[in-house]
């Protein structure tokens, strides 16, 4: 609901500053991909690097974690003390791969949702039991449209002109086109 581009650019950090006033410890998890992880981390205030961890919820999960590790290191933080929560379309194979890659480098955790409780892909003809996505997001606030960019362009939401504005304002970096599993 920001009036100017500058207010818009600072809005995610203002929300997180408010969150920090209310919550401690394990509830201080950064979700950076709303307007693009690369731009979010590039403009993030230093105090945010002291939070408990980060949730990687779109784009390539390994690339997202590597970006977070590099960001923490630039801010003098020890990545091995940080929590990385991977949570986008995970299955057993992805969890095992990410766990191996980041073992000893970060505290890895996995938000395993739909594919934990509905991994019946291919059991019936025509994928009759295929999982579906049930995600609720606000589409407007105070009569103005909302926008979500994500690190995956397939997850973008909002009017095209506003998406273009947000990409410009937040300096959206590289987006990884990944098929949406659910």
Locate the predicted segments by residue.
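Buried, small/hydrophobic-residue-enriched core segments of structured protein domains
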Residues: 1-64, 97, 102, 140-144
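Gly/Ser/Thr/Ala-enriched C-terminal appendages of enzymes
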Residues: 37, 50, 59-82, 87-182
């Amino acid at each position: 609901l920001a009036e100017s581009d500058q207010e818009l650019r600072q809005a995610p950090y203002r929300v997180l500053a408010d969150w920090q006033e209310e919550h401690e410890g394990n509830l201080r998890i950064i979700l950076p991909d709303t307007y693009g992880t690369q731009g979010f981390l590039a403009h993030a205030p230093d105090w945010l690097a002291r939070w408990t961890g980060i949730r990687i919820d779109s784009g390539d999960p390994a690339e997202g974690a590597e970006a977070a590790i590099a960001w923490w290191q630039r801010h003098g933080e020890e990545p091995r003390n940080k929590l990385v929560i991977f949570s986008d379309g995970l299955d057993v194979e992805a969890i095992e791969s990410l766990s191996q890659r980041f073992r000893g480098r970060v505290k890895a955790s996995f938000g395993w949702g739909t594919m934990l409780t509905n991994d019946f892909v291919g059991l019936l003809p025509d994928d009759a039991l295929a999982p579906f996505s049930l995600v609720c997001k606000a589409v407007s606030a105070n009569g103005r449209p909302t926008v979500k960019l994500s690190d995956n362009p397939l997850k973008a939401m909002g009017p095209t002109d506003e998406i273009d504005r947000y990409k410009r304002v937040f300096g959206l970096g590289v987006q990884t086109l990944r098929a949406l599993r659910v």
